[in-house]
């Protein structure tokens, strides 16, 4: 397995990650999420990869499914790629920059598709990731209520939370079923 790191001095060379020293959200988290989503997908194209699966973990990756399905729609590199999102309870209170939806729409994504992130909360980001994924994994024992309700309402394949030591074989089976186009859930 090859591992690549997506980096940008302006966004990621800070001494903080998501929160500043006063436990407030870093003001450019929205732009960092956009940069990361585009950076990952552009790197895949630049290296001429055609991944079978892109598995996104956590809220910072929440825009990857949207960008892959909309901005890169019709791109041969992603033609057969399945997007899986793992949703966790580790997030944030409050909102990201209120203009996130405008910045995403500026990238050519239909404004109708970004209505849910006009108020860019943790739950809204999880919801947009789930809506644009081919399958979703619950990565935490408990999710925030709004995220859990959105997860429960999904029509695409899902995998319920499993203890990490039990999930490896189940995840392989889940990947195989997604690649084969089966529409089934895996219960934990």
Where are these regions (language model features)?
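Catalytic cores of nucleotide-sugar-dependent glycosyltransferases that transfer UDP/GDP/TDP-activated
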Residues: 1-188
């Amino acid at each position: 397995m090859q591992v690549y790191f997506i980096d940008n001095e302006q966004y990621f060379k800070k001494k903080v990650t998501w929160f500043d020293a006063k436990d407030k959200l870093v003001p450019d988290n929205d732009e960092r999420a956009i940069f990361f989503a585009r950076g990952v997908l552009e790197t895949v194209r630049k290296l001429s990869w055609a991944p079978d699966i892109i598995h996104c973990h956590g809220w910072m990756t929440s825009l990857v499914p949207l960008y892959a399905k909309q901005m890169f729609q019709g791109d041969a590199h992603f033609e057969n790629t399945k997007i899986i999102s793992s949703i966790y309870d580790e997030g944030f209170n409050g909102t990201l920059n209120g203009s996130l939806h405008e910045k995403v729409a500026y990238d050519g994504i239909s404004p109708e598709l970004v209505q849910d992130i006009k108020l860019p909360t943790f739950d809204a980001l999880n919801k947009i990731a789930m809506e644009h994924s081919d399958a979703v994994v619950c990565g935490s024992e408990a999710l925030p209520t709004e995220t859990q309700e959105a997860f429960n309402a999904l029509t695409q394949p899902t995998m319920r939370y499993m203890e990490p030591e039990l999930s490896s074989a189940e995840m392989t089976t889940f990947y195989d079923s997604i690649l084969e186009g089966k529409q089934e859930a895996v219960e934990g």
